[in-house]
Amino acid sequence: MLSFVSAWILSALVAQTPTEPRAVLLEKIPADAAVVVSLRGIDKVQAHLEGMLTAMSPTWGGQAGPMLRLSIGQMTAQFGTEATRSPFTVAMDLPKADGELPAFAVLIPIEDYRSVLKSLAGTVEAPKLEAVGGGVEKFTNKTGDTIYAYDGEGFIAFAQESDAMVKRIAAKPAATLGSKLSTELREALLGGDLGFYINVAAIQARYGDQIEAMRAQFMAALDQAGDQMQQQGQMNAAKQHYGALFDAAKEAESLALNFDFDKAAFDLSAFLTLKTDSPALASLKNAKTGNSDGLAKLPPGYLFYGYMNTDPKSMQGLMKMNASSTFPGGASGSPAAQKYLDSMMELGRQESLTAMTYGGGVEVLALTIPENVEQTTSAMVELMKTMAQSPAIKEATLEEKVDTYKGFVLNKASMRFDFEKMLGDQAGNPMAAGMVKAMVGEDNATTTYFGSDGKQLVSATAKSLEEAHQKIDQLSDEKAGIGTKPGYQALMSRLPKETNALFAVNAQRLVRFIGQILGTVAGGDPIAPPADMPTEMALFGGSLATHPSGYRLDFVLPSAVGPVLEKGLVPIVQGIQGQVNQ
């Protein structure tokens, strides 16, 4: 079917309209369409994609450019220069029976009906038409395929083999997709070079039983994998995570997303709406977003940066998933863990800023602004006590109120991990060993200083009290924070400031982390990236924001990340492959 669509698109795009018409085409499509695809224009997408790849890597652009231009050249030679310039939209229904191809139609904003028919037929003269009712006509192209076409007002719709969607469009539906879509869904569909709309509720209604059967099979496979690897705790966490995704699909109404190719970055933006009677939608009535500008004060040099603005229920859900991977049987298998989870509902809303890195151990610097400071500080103490009971912890000590610095009353928690128990049945897996060793360090230990000043809670891993002081000082030195870095500014300028969760990944630190893991897997020292890897910090990341009708998701990959991957990660991977092949 996709090959048919491609052929039709190539043959039918024979004129250009003076303005962006994709929004107008939405007014021609039935509101209950299952899937809609919207393309800005083949020539524009080709130019944007080639420009983005070249900005990320002249090598990548040089490899992709000729192939893209060749395709455009072939289309131009066969169908004319206008063939590549017009935007188009594809509307699709769900199949009516198993094995039946879905009915769909291509819509293009062109008024020269006869020229389009000649291109579709592959003939010099317009094909002989036969009326099939409702203003729809059919003809046979030179390869013997039946084509159905409709000459609309300022647009043309056509399809192959099935006239169902073309007839629905020709009937001028009273309820159209254009009138159905909210502003957020419309922007998500049309905001980039390539957009998709999916009627999730219709798909769930049609295939709900099959989806539920897939869920049961998938969960059973996770249980089996957990038993075989003796990692049931991690599998329980995975089951909760994927189970939540299956549940979300049941409550979802519509999804729209777009991909945008720009010289400055690759952008993905999506919006998911929920059913009006769904519990998830009811929970969003009191949802609040927060401003992520505080991330700018965090110091550079970390692998991961994160902002979160969460209500107690959401925080409890996150901690419950963490407990599933930390304790056998999850929180229910640890009274202390369950007690801590129960206390989460009393803490109120929390905003947190976190910087974290791996490699030689976990290094964390976090600042939390809680609604209830005293309860949150007490909960942090209880969390450290609870973690000490995890089978993965060999030794643990907690010293309360060991120091006061800049108003923060600091506690000290020290833990030594049981490397073998963390690996479980994966003790003989070099990749697993490399991952764990990178996280816990050579001495398998970590020390965290944490406490509040009555307004906010700070947490910092450090080998000494003096180092903890230095990290706390970094939080107040905004002139030295990542906010001054071009890589941070490039990322944040393309993400919404008001959000519930935002993450940013340091590309250089990611390359070094991967090099450390692969070096361990190969039985040697960490593999350092080549000296010519760019040193200017490049960040990529994304965000998730609640909305009264659903959720907005954004992801940004700035072009500056490309040279880091090309000159840093690619040589490391190639070096490992060379060792394996020797």
Place the predicted regions along the sequence by residue:
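Composition- and surface-driven signal marking solvent-exposed, interaction-prone regions
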Residues: A170-K172, F271-T273, A282-A287, K320-M321, ...
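Short, solvent-exposed coil/turn segments at beta-strand boundaries
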Residues: P30-A31, L101, Y150-I156, A265, ...
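A cross-kingdom marker for long, charged
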Residues: K288-S292, G451-D453, L539-Q582
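Long compositionally biased, domain-poor regions of proteins
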Residues: T81-D93, K339-E363, V373-E374, T386, ...
